[in-house]
């Protein structure tokens, strides 16, 4: 599974700032878009980085180690306040594009729908307050219950519209959380 296109929402007055900000970041194979929205939506998502370049990219940042995943990451905020992660997984082939995208809601119900697209739970659990990871190591939809704190800030997760197109079989589409999220696989 790979993220081909992701469309998120942001306040209209920040769209130009976001375009300028992400124009300077290599988003690899993923097309990242922002559309105007009411309110102040925010998301958690992560970009892949090559393992060999991680220390260079993370210079001056607080680094978090994930030994169970053989991964390292650092975090920052973009102009809209999104919690953005840069993560490197040792041994991951072709580490480009988006690595993670957080979806907030009923984790068990979302997982049941995502299984129709061939995505499997590869880590985590559906226990109350816990995260579930669908997809594969390095290319993951993170299912989070509402109000669970995102790393590293602890900021409570919120539900905001997401449209995502994933590559790889089987082809199909699902809508989650009453149509708030639309996930297409082609």
Label the model's feature ranges.
Residues 19-26, 50-58, 87-90:
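Short, intrinsically disordered, charge-balanced linker/junction segments flanking boundaries
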Residues 120-124, 128-186:
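Charged, low-complexity intrinsically disordered regulatory/assembly segments
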Residues 4-12, 36-59, 72-77, 97-106, ...:
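Vicinal oxygen chelate
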Residues 1-33, 69-71, 106-140, 146-147:
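Core segments of cupin and vicinal oxygen chelate
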Residues 59-116:
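Surface-exposed beta-loop interaction hotspot
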């Amino acid at each position: 599974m790979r993220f081909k296109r992701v469309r998120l929402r942001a306040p209209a007055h920040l769209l130009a700032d976001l375009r300028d900000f992400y124009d300077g970041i290599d988003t690899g194979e993923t097309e990242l878009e922002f559309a105007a929205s009411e309110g102040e939506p925010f998301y958690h998502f992560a970009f892949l980085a090559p393992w060999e370049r991680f220390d260079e990219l993370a210079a001056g940042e607080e680094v978090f180690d994930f030994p169970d995943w053989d991964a390292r990451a650092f975090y920052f905020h973009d102009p809209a306040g999104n919690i953005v992660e840069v993560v490197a997984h040792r041994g991951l082939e072709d580490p480009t594009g988006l690595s993670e995208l957080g979806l907030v809601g009923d984790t068990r119900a979302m997982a049941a729908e995502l299984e129709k697209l061939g995505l499997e739970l590869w880590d985590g659990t559906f226990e109350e307050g816990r995260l579930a990871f669908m997809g594969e190591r390095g290319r993951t939809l993170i299912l989070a219950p509402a109000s669970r704190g995102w790393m590293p800030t602890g900021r409570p997760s919120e539900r905001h519209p997401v449209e995502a197109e994933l590559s790889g079989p089987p082809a199909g589409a699902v809508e989650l959380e009453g149509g708030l999220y639309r996930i297409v696989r082609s």
